[in-house]
Curated annotation (Swiss-Prot):
The lineage of its organism: Bacteria, Pseudomonadati, Pseudomonadota, Alphaproteobacteria, Rickettsiales. It is an enzyme of class 2 (transferase). Its EC number is 2.7.7.6. Keywords: DNA-directed RNA polymerase, Nucleotidyltransferase, Transcription, Transferase. This is DNA-directed RNA polymerase subunit beta. GO terms for cellular component: DNA-directed RNA polymerase complex. The keyword Transferase applies.
Length: 1373
């Protein structure tokens, strides 16, 4: 056996990784979790459960929906359709083919269903199985997720955004005194299910409790309690305690003394011990709870109260006549003076009354007596009348409706989360599998609501992240699936009842279109399925990690208040407090924090390190907001000694409610993993974030997402250390799938022989086809460049090719440029930016943008449209870029108005008959009359044609261009196949050679003699095919050769088969929309150089527009002659408080000066003035321990590393744990610069020094996607609105500029009457005047006449619509 790990080059690719000088002090224990895990886990793992065997699938996602909808039975229970299992076929087209052909990337869902037919005996009613049919049924194509967490729908990449919504469960709150004029708090409760009716409970101003179902008319709460089967006695006994008053002869009543019921007040009568008769306190004296407890402790059990004390109390049971047992008063009735006289007359000795006091109000009792419904039937009918007004209420219908509302699993679902939340809030212990309401739930909700009113407990905070959960992709699509399957269930039942069930197969019953249409509708039109923001890799990642409170079942931006949008203490480590849009969506659309993840219940969790006895361990625990409230959590920057013990007498900790307390080290339960866990990915890319104002940091995070990928990428000198993670997880770069050795590299693809052996011991081959000049969703350019060389050894997950906006595996959204802060002739007034000509000349900020144009040749009723070069009335000059078919060549330079694809459409006075159509088809006649409908380059676009794609309908003959493109693609596929085969052959034949050398030949080709011993030289003279003809003596060797031959043939056959399938797919024609014969797509790439009007920004929210490009010789320059690239206005800093940019500039200044110092050392080393030790010493002083791995390598590699940092030393200053001002000064000193970071600058125009020192340094700037080329627009003549006859507005309509009301005032103020008349007539909507003006211009005259503007006629028509006739009377002057 040959080992694949032989002859591996010593140098792995990981040696090329960039090393940054890291200023962070906190040791990272946890890695950043995969940034798009939230999308992939939710959909693939939890919803589809792809690649999991049927028997091992958990009851969640698709499996649980199918289990809940099936079995489906018909009305008579004769037929029963059961679900067995489901599986997915392989998708017809891969991701790339789907995006090229405008198709959806989806896999067919095959569900195995079992149809059981029963025989029912009409007399006995017994059932017997008559027959069982099992069949695999196609249920439509289900969109699959790409490896980057997106969906391809109709050829475009889309993202399904996760939604934040209120968690199911019960919530208690009050109106904050806003409803009632007195400011009285009205408490209410709401039960929110996952699906089903909402139940609201509320107090009114008179302290009566009501309930509503689905916000309908309110009813008394006791109606609901009676409906769930409680009697008056049960209601009173459940919600109230009872106390007995015993008659004491001639003295009054003795009653139990309960100190808990005593509040501080002055006594109106004496406090007398009923057992001893002692007076403990006189009337008028004050009693307090503490004094009451003291008396109770001293043995006071019963107290004596006056006879009339009972008046106003409520009975806790029926009052009966001791002699006749007749009911004198019912439970809950108030004792009046008359009733007291009856009690005295009948000598009733014991009276039981309700305990009602300030801690236990009479609300339920009052509601009970206000409610007219006295039994369950009346209560149910009352509820029925509210929910179904106008329908006759009978008890069966009412009972069925009430059961279906809250107790039917089909219609009401609290979900597991809802049940957990309900149990915890109401202190119940009901099984998590019970996801409907129970009687206990309702009773206890009322209990908790009344307790809140009595001042016990606290209301819920709706914005607490324990009360808001996240619905990710999987769950959102699961809900759509359920809707689709429920609709399908109805059609299945109809079909079962309609046809002869005995002859039907399962596929006859199922109509998959219903299901497919619901899923399609979700992906195409839902507010949460969004066109992916693909401006750059960061914007992609951020879009996938977005949390939206909007969307179906969420909030609407008009009704969302301030509280929902605000930052909540529980957002810490879960939702970024910085990154959110400016504008009306602020706070409603958020971004997940860097380390956050979503647990199985949909709550966001954040990681913490466990602290045991004051020692910080490396154990990382993820806590949700609910769990976190129970612990004391320290900050990540708490001081820790070498042994991990927390230092200091007290540690600052967060506790529940977002408050901070100081506790001793042994009381701390957890500490943060890293300070970076607070912010999102975009915010974690901002160095010195801690020195920026939050508003500017917000703008900085948002603007990084708008940075355009540039031609030349450049990772920031001053980074935060997260750049590599973002590039890796975004999917922009290419990662190695396995360990391996690079066999071939060119700009289009990388071939790697992997080191993971297959079962037969042969290597597998990974071929990575790189994306070249592809168009992104936002017309930016996706282009991948290889980072590896032939012979490199790569490890799994190494980055082997850079994508857009990445540089050596790190995200690189902009460029490092030399910046000076000083005013320059007013050209950088109000955030304007002044740039040097060098930046334009050297393409520093040049980007490529790709536009796609499409033309469709359709079959019209006058005959087919044709793509051709033969276009009527078009000059040969205009056709110069088209090939013989009429399609533009690749590489052609085009400008606005040029023809891209020639197309003619038949036009005729009358439609042609079928006979004519047939004759034309037979004799090949062209249409008599055609019009030009070619695809032209639209206005404002120019560039180079980089790609052309031609799609032809199946059965339509392909033209030469389509055949040429197809041939090109087949050649590419063949090359991939041949290269893979070559690597396998190389391996197989070198293995064969090892086996054969030294063996004795028995039989073989002509060139060899029998009995000879095989040598390497002998084998070199044979062709590869002749190796198999050799037979040797050793039987074991022959067996092994036979095995190798079998494996080799299988491998070759599999490769050929795969190639044939792909070729067949290419040649088979395309699925085009109805009526389309041919589709041609043309891609034009445009280079956008930086120019005045383009918007630029830094990472700190400092944005501006370019005002002027200045020649290099006029720009300020340094004393060594270096010209400054960009001049910014220093006045943009103080008021905006984003000081991080200044620290970045200073550290950038240190970076390039340290690089110069290293270059000088390398020069001296080459000139033999110094040894390698001095270089090592300087590198250790600069990088610290980070550099040890490099210093252990040979001298050439150390020098090669020094050359890599010759442009600038790369720093990492992690957010909230980065470089302090002193660190920046130390770096400046090490670089031999003034620690102030300021230098003398010379004015390029005068050659004189500026008066003061100027802050100069390297700063990272981005070019944003707001390019002046896409915004600038002008019009002389163009389209007019049909009704008003005024020019249209906006660039997309080629419109004019509106001369509005205020502009008219300006002309009136100047008295410019003629100009005003011209603006309001001929330049606007005076149709005749326009024509006359044109005539006079053509004749060379300068005068014009204005007539009546069309708007005047429109106004007259509007008057007429109001039945007012207005006539214009023209009087001759």
């Amino acid at each position: 056996m040959v080992s694949l790990r032989d002859n591996i080059e010593a140098q792995p690719l990981s040696h090329n990784r960039r090393i940054r000088k890291n200023f962070g002090h906190i040791n990272l224990v946890a890695d950043i979790p995969n940034l798009i895990e939230i999308q992939k886990n939710s959909y693939e793992k939890n919803f589809l459960q792809l690649n999991i065997k049927d028997s091992e699938r958990k009851n969640k996602g698709l499996q649980s929906i199918l289990n809940s909808i099936f079995p489906i039975s018909d009305s008579s229970n004769i037929a029963n359709l059961e679900f067995v299992k489901y599986e997915f076929d392989t998708p017809k087209y891969d991701v790339e083919e789907c995006s090229q052909r405008s198709l959806s990337y989806a896999a067919p869902l095959k569900v195995t269903l079992r149809l059981s037919i029963w025989d029912i005996d009409e007399d006995t009613g017994t059932r017997e199985i008559k027959g069982i049919k099992e069949q695999e049924v196609y249920m439509g194509d289900i969109p699959l997720m790409t490896k980057n967490g997106t969906f391809i729908i109709n050829g475009t990449e889309r993202v399904v955004v996760s939604q934040m919504h209120r968690s199911p469960g019960v919530f208690f709150y009050h109106d904050e005194g806003k409803v009632h004029s007195s400011g009285k708090l009205l408490y209410s409760a709401r039960v929110i299910p996952y699906r089903g009716s909402w139940l609201d409970l509320e107090f009114d101003a008179k302290d009566v409790i009501y309930f509503r179902i689905d916000r309908k008319r309110k009813l008394y709460i006791t109606t609901l309690l009676r409906a769930i089967g409680m009697s008056t006695e049960e209601i009173i006994k459940f919600y109230y305690n009872s106390v007995t008053y015993k008659l004491v002869k001639n003295k009054g009543w003795a009653v139990k003394f309960i100190p808990q019921h005593i509040t501080a007040h002055r006594l109106t009568s004496d406090l007398v011990d009923a057992d001893t008769g002692n007076i403990l306190l006189k009337a008028g004296q004050k009693i307090t709870p503490r004094l009451a407890k003291k008396y109770f402790g001293e043995g006071l059990n019963n107290i004596l109260v006056a006879h009339e004390t009972l008046i106003g109390k409520y009975l806790s049971e029926d009052l009966r006549d001791p002699t006749s047992d007749e009911v004198l008063a019912k439970i809950g009735e108030m004792i009046t003076a008359d009733m007291l006289n009856v009690i005295n007359a009948l000598k009733i000795k014991n009276v039981n009354v309700l305990v009602i006091n300030p801690q236990s109000g009479p609300y339920i009792r009052n509601t009970l007596f206000a409610d007219k419904n006295q039994d369950r039937e009346a209560a149910l009918c009352d509820i029925f009348r509210v929910l179904r007004p106008g329908e006759p209420a009978n008890i069966e219908a009412a009972e069925s409706l009430f059961y279906n509302l809250f107790f039917d699993v089909e219609r009401y679902d609290l979900s597991e989360v809802g049940r957990i939340k309900m149990n915890s809030r109401l202190e119940l212990n009901i099984s998590e599998e019970v996801t409907v309401l129970t009687i206990d739930d309702i009773k206890n909700i009322v209990r908790v609501l009344v307790e809140l009113k009595d001042g016990k407990g606290i209301i819920d905070d709706i914005d607490h992240l324990g009360n808001r959960r996240v619905r990710s992709v999987g769950e959102l699509i699961e809900n759509q699936f359920r809707i689709g399957l429920v609709r399908m269930e109805k059609s299945v039942i109809e079909r079962m009842s309609a046809g002869d069930v005995d002859t039907v197969m399962p596929h006859d019953l199922v109509n998959s279109k219903i299901l497919v249409s619901v899923v399609k509708e979700f992906f195409n039109t839902s507010q949460l399925s969004q066109f992916m923001d693909q401006t750059n890799p960061l914007s992609e990642i951020t879009h996938k990690r977005r949390l939206s409170a909007l969307g179906p079942g969420g909030l609407s931006r008009d009704r969302a208040g301030f509280e929902v949008r605000d930052v909540h203490p529980t957002h810490y480590g879960r939702i970024c407090p910085i990154e959110t849009p400016e504008g009306q969506n602020i706070g409603l659309i958020n971004s997940m924090a860097t380390y956050a993840r979503i647990n199985k219940h949909g709550f966001i969790e954040s990681p913490y390190r466990r602290v045991k006895d004051g020692c910080v361990t490396d154990e990382v625990v993820y806590l949700s907001a609910i769990e976190e409230g129970k612990y004391k959590i320290g900050q990540a920057n708490s001081k820790v000694n070498k042994d991990g013990k927390l230092q200091g007498e007290f540690i600052n900790c967060r506790v529940e409610g977002g408050n901070f307390v100081m506790v001793e080290p042994y009381e701390v339960d957890f500490i943060d993993v890293t300070p970076m866990q607070v912010v999102s990915v975009a915010a974690s890319l901002i160095p010195f974030l801690e020195n920026d104002d939050a508003n500017r940091a917000l703008m900085g995070s948002n603007m990084q997402r708008q940075a355009v990928p540039l031609i030349k990428t450049d990772a920031p000198f001053v980074g935060t250390g997260v750049e590599g993670v973002v590039a890796k997880d975004s999917g922009a770069s290419v990662l190695a799938l396995h360990d391996g050795i690079v066999e071939q590299v060119d700009s289009n693809r990388i071939v790697i022989r992997t080191l993971e052996q297959k079962v037969d011991g042969s290597p597998s081959v990974d071929i990575y086809n790189l994306l070249k000049f592809q168009k992104s969703n936002h017309n930016t350019c996706i282009n991948q460049k290889p980072l590896v060389k032939v012979g490199h050894y790569v490890k799994k997950n190494d980055i082997i090719a850079d994508g857009p906006s990445t540089d050596n595996g790190e995200i690189a959204l902009g460029r490092n440029v030399l910046v000076a802060f000083l005013p320059w002739n007013g050209y950088n007034f109000e955030d304007s930016i002044l740039i040097s000509e060098r930046i334009v000349k050297e393409d520093v900020f040049t980007s490529i943008h790709i536009e796609e144009f499409e033309v469709i040749a359709r079959d019209t009723r006058l005959g087919p449209e044709e793509i051709t070069r033969d276009i009527p009335n078009v000059s040969e000059e205009a056709l110069r870029h088209l090939d013989e078919v009429g399609i533009i060549y690749i590489g052609a330079e085009v400008k606005a108005g040029d023809i891209l694809v020639g197309k003619v459409t038949p036009k005729s006075e009358s439609p042609i008959t079928p006979e004519e159509k047939l004759l034309r088809a037979i004799f090949g006649e062209k249409a008599f009359d055609v019009k030009d409908s070619s695809l032209h380059v639209p206005s404002g676009v120019s560039g180079t044609v980089v790609e052309v794609r031609v799609f032809s309908r199946r059965g339509v003959e392909k033209d030469q261009r389509a055949i040429a493109i197809e041939k090109q693609q087949i050649e590419k596929l063949a090359k991939d196949r041949d290269d893979e085969l070559e690597i396998i052959e190389h391996f197989v034949f070198s293995w064969l050679e090892k086996l054969l050398v030294g063996q004795v030949i028995i039989n073989g080709p002509k060139q060899v003699k029998v009995g000879q011993t095989i040598t390497t030289e002998m084998l070199k003279g044979l062709s590869k095919g002749q190796f198999w003809q050799i037979t040797v003596e050793d039987a074991n060797v022959m067996n092994e050769i036979e095995q190798i031959k079998t494996h080799y043939d299988e491998k070759k056959e599999a490769l050929d088969k795969r190639f044939a399938t792909k070729v067949e797919k290419l040649q088979s024609g395309d699925d085009l929309p109805q009526g389309a014969l041919k589709v041609v797509k043309v891609f034009i790439a445009t280079k956008h150089k930086l120019q005045p009007g383009d918007k630029m920004a830094g990472r700190h929210g400092n944005k501006g527009v370019i005002s002027r490009i200045v020649p290099e010789e006029d720009m300020p320059f340094l004393e060594d002659g270096t010209v400054v690239d960009i001049v910014l206005n220093p006045l943009g800093l103080p008021s905006r408080m984003n000081i991080g940019q200044i620290l970045e500039t200073h550290l950038g200044w240190a970076s390039i000066n340290l690089a110069k110092k290293i270059s000088t050392l390398v020069k001296e080393y080459k000139n033999k003035h110094i040894g390698i030790e001095q270089i090592k010493k300087f590198l250790i002083e600069l990088y610290g321990e980070n550099i040890n791995s490099i210093l252990e390598r040979p001298e050439e590699e150390i020098i090669s590393f020094c050359k890599k940092v010759s442009k600038g030393v790369h720093f990492a200053t992690p957010v909230f744990d980065g470089a302090k001002v002193q660190d920046v000064k130390d770096m400046l000193k090490l670089a031999g610069q003034d620690p102030s970071g300021q230098v003398k600058l010379i004015d390029g125009r005068t050659g004189e020094y500026f008066d003061r020192l100027v802050t100069v340094g390297q700063k990272y700037l981005l070019k944003l996607h707001h390019l002046v080329d896409n915004k600038i627009h002008s019009r002389s003549i163009g389209p007019y609105s049909l009704v008003t006859q005024q020019p249209l507005g906006g660039k997309s309509h080629f419109g004019g500029q509106r001369f509005g009301e205020m502009e008219c005032w300006a002309l009136q103020a100047y008295g410019a009457a003629y100009t005003l008349q011209e603006m309001l007539t001929v330049k606007s909507d005076d149709v005749n005047g326009r024509i006359k003006t044109y005539d006079s211009i053509v004749r060379g005259e300068n005068n014009f006449e204005s007539g009546i503007p069309e708007s005047f006629n429109v106004m007259i028509k509007e008057f007429r619509s109001l039945c007012l006739n207005v006539k214009l009377e023209v009087t001759s002057s």
